[in-house]
Swiss-Prot record:
The species this protein was found in: Mus musculus
Entry-linked InterPro entries: Sprouty, Sprouty_domain
Gene encoding the protein: Spry2
Listed name of the protein: Protein sprouty homolog 2
Domain characteristics, as noted in the entry: The Cys-rich domain is responsible for the localization of the protein to the membrane ruffles.
Gene Ontology biological process: branching morphogenesis of an epithelial tube; bud elongation involved in lung branching; cell fate commitment; cellular response to leukemia inhibitory factor; cellular response to vascular endothelial growth factor stimulus; ERK1 and ERK2 cascade; establishment of mitotic spindle orientation; fibroblast growth factor receptor signaling pathway
GO molecular function: molecular function inhibitor activity; protein kinase binding; protein serine/threonine kinase activator activity; protein serine/threonine kinase inhibitor activity; ubiquitin-protein transferase inhibitor activity
Amino acid sequence: MEARAQSGNGSQPLLQTAHDSGRQRGEPDPRDALTQQVHVLSLDQIRAIRNTNEYTEGPTVVPRPGLKPAPRPSTQHKHERLHGLPEHRQPPRLQPSQVHSSRAPLSRSISTVSSGSRSSTRTSTSSSSSEQRLLGPSFSHGPAAADGIIRVQPKSELKPGDVKPLSKDDLGLHAYRCEDCGKCKCKECTYPRPLPSDWICDKQCLCSAQNVIDYGTCVCCVKGLFYHCSNDDEDNCADNPCSCSQSHCCTRWSAMGVMSLFLPCLWCYLPAKGCLKLCQGCYDRVNRPGCRCKNSNTVCCKVPTVPPRNFEKPT
């Protein structure tokens, strides 16, 4: 057993030596090949690579439709640098003749832009000068000249023969007066003034004196009965049931007498109607400004004397 163990332990170094000898005789180890291929860069070389920047762009100018766009060499530089970075190669530099040819269209475009700006300034100055010519000297001299602007249209000279006599319309509506009382006789002034009908709830509720009497004395019931019983459309007895001049006077009065037995407030209608007429006359006398005379002569008011106008030229 001990002999076998010794023989087994001794076989391992033999295998290792045989394996090492096989490596030396055959191909080399790939680890050694990797270490040989990797080159260690110094700090100066790294700084030099980072400092050299070949990607530059010039000022961009909008090309005109007549001109061809200038070639951009910077894009070529960029693509070459991207492909050359893993191989640590620097892109080829352009020759001075190529740089000069690429800058030529750029200078042409800049000159055309500058000439266009000059033409635009010329047109703006010419337009402003034309506007000042149209506005005149009053607007060109600033706010001080605005005081001399004419704000009133000058009137033409008046001649003595152009003055016409005043017509009836020029005299006014209140020019015709009564000869007896001296008050105006126009329709507006002589119209009778009725009692106010919207004197309740700050002139918002319509309540006339006639309606108060009709509802207070139950005459509204009589008017409704006459309205439904009348066959003639032209018969307005329902509006004036106590009228003596309209048709069916006896029939209406007899019907109201029978209804007064059941509605005794109907006996107060005639006295209330008389009081209403009296109040109406008093109110009209106080508030009517015109004439109340029945038969009077009308006199036209004299036009007040006006001093003669001065027809001389204004200074």
